[in-house]
Amino acid sequence: MKLWGGRFKKDLDKLMEDFNSSISFDIRLLKYDIMGSIAHAKGLYKAGVLTEEELNLIEKGLKEILEESELKEIPQDEDVHSYVERLLVEKIGDVGRKLHTGRSRNDQVATDERLYLRDEIDKIKEDLIKLIDTLKEMAETYKETIMPGYTHLQRAQPVTFGHYLLAYVEMFKRDLSRLDDMMKRVNVMPLGSGALAGTTFNIDRYYVASLLGFDDITLNSMDGVSDRDFVIEFLSFASITMMHLSRFCEELILWSTKEFDFIEMDDRFSTGSSMMPQKKNPDAAELIRGKTGRVYGDLITILTVMKGLPLAYNKDMQEDKEALFDGIDTLKMSLKVFTEMIKTIKVKTDNMEKAAKYGYMNATDFADYLVQKGIPFRTAHEIAGKVVLYAIERNLPIEELSLEELKKFSDVIEKDVYEAIDIKNILKKRKTIGSPRIF
């Protein structure tokens, strides 16, 4: 069913018909299209456009369409809107043709997308909270498991595995706050904007918005139909969240190698090689890392689509949906897989703690010890560097150098230096909020 055509002399070319169609992907909006249509019908009734009997017929017909919406094959209609209207007219006759009064597909689809995204945001919030809770539980378990902390992928200072996990908790908490803030801009209703210039029918937009659970309405009809900031903002959020997952996955992939040997991936989230029998590959983590680029691509798609569009609606904007849907699907699956994967890793605490004892990661605390003895930090830093070089040349850790050797570098060094640079004591002495302190 076409929702237009009166001013045309020729039928649409079959090639153009296929090119123009969006039903194969926007059918996902069916539930939300029907929700919006029911609310719009109630707005038309309140405005005196529909009788009570007509409203009841339309509402009943739309609900039946939703109940019968399991598709055996993709319909041949142009889009989800024309599909719903065709079914409605088939069910209730010409009364169904009144539904589109005072409405354009431009404000209709913008409303559908916001309703859909609103629900998806709630689902993603649940997934993020589950991941955060999982990491918090693991951090409690490993709060005293000492491991190397890295900068430039070089051993830097000792931390705990629990502290490391909580670093990602902070990242995902920021992602969660972005979702909450975004909802203020997503949950605004454009319905009533018409094609771009509103409508002559006195539809109470605030009433319709309240029926659909929107917090507010758009205040400019041209912006209402042409705004896709909410799609861009969501995909920006999704890209940042995927980036956090990807960084986490990169470290897990590295740590699962024999070169690090800090963790082992569970069989349920690993695969083998078709040629090399010994292989156990961290494919779940690698796929999440790879799919991050896919979500970045979704964001770039909509940014590129929108960058040169004049006001108001343009058909280019049909391209927003596949990017949005793909970004949502990819993020949701990645969050679910990652949460289950991280719960099942085997943490090799002995290897972590062994690695923390090497690499001269107590050098900073050696310098701090000298500062506490009255030496300026910059001088203490230089002395500590010379001690590290001396220890490296002898293939010894600092703590295995004799007191006599250490005193060659500064006469303020006493026997208490060994307590000051002990790895466990280092973490017990951390004082600032946010440090990896062991109690």
Curated annotation (Swiss-Prot):
<dbReference type="GO" id="GO:0004056">
    <property type="term" value="F:argininosuccinate lyase activity"/>
</dbReference>
<keyword id="KW-0456">Lyase</keyword>
<dbReference type="GO" id="GO:0005829">
    <property type="term" value="C:cytosol"/>
</dbReference>
<dbReference type="InterPro" id="IPR020557">
    <property type="entry name" value="Fumarate_lyase_CS"/>
</dbReference>
<dbReference type="InterPro" id="IPR024083">
    <property type="entry name" value="Fumarase/histidase_N"/>
</dbReference>
<keyword id="KW-0028">Amino-acid biosynthesis</keyword>
<keyword id="KW-0963">Cytoplasm</keyword>
<dbReference type="InterPro" id="IPR000362">
    <property type="entry name" value="Fumarate_lyase_fam"/>
</dbReference>
<dbReference type="InterPro" id="IPR009049">
    <property type="entry name" value="Argininosuccinate_lyase"/>
</dbReference>
<keyword id="KW-0055">Arginine biosynthesis</keyword>
<protein>
    <recommendedName>
        <fullName>Argininosuccinate lyase</fullName>
        <ecNumber>4.3.2.1</ecNumber>
    </recommendedName>
</protein>
<dbReference type="GO" id="GO:0006526">
    <property type="term" value="P:L-arginine biosynthetic process"/>
</dbReference>
<dbReference type="InterPro" id="IPR029419">
    <property type="entry name" value="Arg_succ_lyase_C"/>
</dbReference>
<dbReference type="GO" id="GO:0042450">
    <property type="term" value="P:arginine biosynthetic process via ornithine"/>
</dbReference>
<dbReference type="Pfam" id="PF00206">
    <property type="entry name" value="Lyase_1"/>
</dbReference>
<dbReference type="InterPro" id="IPR022761">
    <property type="entry name" value="Fumarate_lyase_N"/>
</dbReference>
<comment type="pathway">
    <text>Amino-acid biosynthesis; L-arginine biosynthesis; L-arginine from L-ornithine and carbamoyl phosphate: step 3/3.</text>
</comment>
<dbReference type="Pfam" id="PF14698">
    <property type="entry name" value="ASL_C2"/>
</dbReference>
<dbReference type="InterPro" id="IPR008948">
    <property type="entry name" value="L-Aspartase-like"/>
</dbReference>
<comment type="similarity">
    <text>Belongs to the lyase 1 family. Argininosuccinate lyase subfamily.</text>
</comment>
